[in-house]
């Protein structure tokens, strides 16, 4: 199935990236020669996505000014008076997607595909009976990440979140495909997508796909510096695609 619409979550404050985010929304911070959100949009355009919703709140005018200069894909804005978090932001934007599944991507995700496009692979792995498909990163492919992961995944791709004190095999990348119907009955407001994942997990309907490339945890200025250094060192590698 071809996934031809997407949403980029760009309304957050980026507290841990201060002081850089005091004057710039985090998705506009540059990595590998361009703002993080531009790399994401380039990858979406590459696989044929035509329409992208970007939610904004903190320093939203800067995102509008920057993104309105793009010729493609077509950008639609979902402006929030106050940040609605990941789940609430998606619910507010749902009318743009109709009944078809769509990508949801954090606006500060950085990855290196290594001659592939993980968004294309995610789209090709989507099955008509799926409700959610999350791109998962093995801990040894998560640069700068020092946590204990988020989920384990069985041979059928079914995800199970780790138990307290357990170390999981995968960390969630912030990249996914979701079906609009999973939000049916949810009231508009501020809430996290994790509440939706938890409900799907209980029914055995939360699926994952392993990222084949590298993913970079860009949470602080220190992480940003090390990520920029990595891309500078690898800029001459042919076929590298970053976001």
Regions found by a protein language model. Give the residues of each.
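Short beta-strand-to-loop element that shapes/binds the nucleotide-sugar donor at the catalytic cleft/hinge
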Residues: 58, 133-150
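Short catalytic helix/loop segments, enriched in acidic residues and glycine
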Residues: 23-36
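A generic "binding-loop/recognition-motif" signal
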Residues: 13, 24, 59, 212-214
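N-proximal low-complexity "stem/linker" segments adjacent to membrane-targeting elements
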Residues: 1-19, 28
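Conserved N-terminal catalytic core of the sugar/cofactor nucleotidyltransferase
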Residues: 1-8, 34-106, 110-112, 117, ...
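Catalytic-core segments of class I nucleotidyltransferases/pyrophosphorylases
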Residues: 101-103, 110, 115-127, 140-143, ...
């Amino acid at each position: 199935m071809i996934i031809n619409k997407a949403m980029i979550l760009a309304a957050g404050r980026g507290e841990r990236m201060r002081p850089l985010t005091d004057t710039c929304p985090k998705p506009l911070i540059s990595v590998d020669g361009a703002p993080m959100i531009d790399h994401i949009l380039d990858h979406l355009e590459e696989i044929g996505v035509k329409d992208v919703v970007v939610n904004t709140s903190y320093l939203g005018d800067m995102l509008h000014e920057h993104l309105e200069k793009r010729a493609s894909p077509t950008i639609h804005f979902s402006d929030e008076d106050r940040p609605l978090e990941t789940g609430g932001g998606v619910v507010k934007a749902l009318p743009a997607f109709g009944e078809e599944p769509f990508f949801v991507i954090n606006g500060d995700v950085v990855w290196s595909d290594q001659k592939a496009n993980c968004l294309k692979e995610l789209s090709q792995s989507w099955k008509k009976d799926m409700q959610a498909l999350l791109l998962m990163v093995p801990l040894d492919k998560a640069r700068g990440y020092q946590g204990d992961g988020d989920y384990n995944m069985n041979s059928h791709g079914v995800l199970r979140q780790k138990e307290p004190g357990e170390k999981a095999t995968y960390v969630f990348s912030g990249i996914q495909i979701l079906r609009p119907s999973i939000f049916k009955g949810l009231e508009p407001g501020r809430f996290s997508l994790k509440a939706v994942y938890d409900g799907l997990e209980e029914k055995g309907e939360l699926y994952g796909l392993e990222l084949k490339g590298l993913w970079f945890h860009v949470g602080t200025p220190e992480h940003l510096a090390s990520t920029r250094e990595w891309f500078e060192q690898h800029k001459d590698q042919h076929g590298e695609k970053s976001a």
